[in-house]
Each structure stands twice: as C-alpha cells, then as structure tokens.
C-alpha cells in the first residue's frame, strides 16, 4: 500500500514544523493537528501513518496521545515526548534524566531494524529532553541506546507497528559521519513512512 496521508500530532513544540516539512519533502500529504484530537476525528481523517511530536510537558499532559497509542490501528512513530508517551501507554516508566540534554548530540547505537534500516551505526542523534524512559514494559523492545550515558533512545512494539525515538530525527544535530547519508533524519522519517506494516 502506498502511503498517502501522514497525521502529525502537535504537542506544542517548535520542532513539529521540521517533522511536517520532512513528510512534505518526501511527497506525502501531511495534516497537523492539536494533541487534543479525538479518536473519531482521527477516523474521519483516515491517515496511513501517525507521528506524535516532541513537546515540553510529560506524557500525562500530552492531550489524548496515550489513548491514541493504545486504541488506534495505524502505524505510529513517537518522537521525544511522543516516544515517552509510547512507553507510558504500555505501562512503562518515564522519569527525570540525571542531566538535562537540550541541544546536545550523542552517539546512538541501534538494532538496524524498523526505522533504523540502512542507517549507519552508530550515528549522532540530537537530544532535547529532561525526561527519559526508565523502565520499558515487556510489550516493547529497546532498539537504540546512547553510548555516552546508556539511556534508552529507541523502542519498538513487539507486535504492533509502533516505534519511538527519544532523540530528534528532525534536528540538525542528527547526522552521520558517512557522506552517503547527508540528511540522516530525513532517511529515518522515510523509513517509518515507507515501512511495510
């Protein structure tokens, strides 16, 4: 199935516009909505993919994001706060990181699957967060970790088409030393949007 429509859920963060631009650059229709969108409204839009954006608050303060993750049958990518929402939606724990990471790049090691398919390993991921996944539920697999502080940087549901990344693919700090990947963040988003689920 060719993906035509991507719904981006805005958790009131300026990075959301970079995500919207990435999806548009890939040639897909993108619709940006507030995090208070209802399940009925999502059904009317009928998207092929959902991206849950970063944001400044906690997962419990991210509008309807946790409920959406638990109830829709559409592939979902969570970025930063969106990733944390995925962890909490399935019973995991999100808490304060030992140090705040706002505008820092870390080397990230990953499993080479899902959104990480054909991505150099490791790569630099841009980090902007003070919260982190502390405990991942059994439904989720850890897919990526930061090499400098060993924090969880990626999760994937074991059965459902749901992935999350703590780092920001859409940040200028997300890059690779490999010249074959001049825009690594765009490739990560493309992998999600074009994955066969």
From Swiss-Prot:
Alphabetical keyword list: Amino-acid biosynthesis, Aromatic amino acid biosynthesis, Glutamine amidotransferase, Lyase, Tryptophan biosynthesis
Cited CDD domains: GATase1_Anthranilate_Synthase
Pathway assigned in UniProt: Amino-acid biosynthesis; L-tryptophan biosynthesis; L-tryptophan from chorismate: step 1/5
The organism's place on the tree of life at top rank: Archaea
Assigned EC number: 4.1.3.27
GO BP term (any one): L-tryptophan biosynthetic process
Catalytic activity: chorismate + L-glutamine = anthranilate + pyruvate + L-glutamate + H(+)
Domain Glutamine amidotransferase type-1 per the UniProt entry, residue ranges: 5-197
Active-site residue list: 80 (nucleophile), 168 (for gatase activity), 170 (for gatase activity)
SUPFAM superfamilies per the UniProt record, alphabetical: Class I glutamine amidotransferase-like
Subunit structure: Heterotetramer consisting of two non-identical subunits: a beta subunit (TrpG) and a large alpha subunit (TrpE).
Protein name: Anthranilate synthase component 2
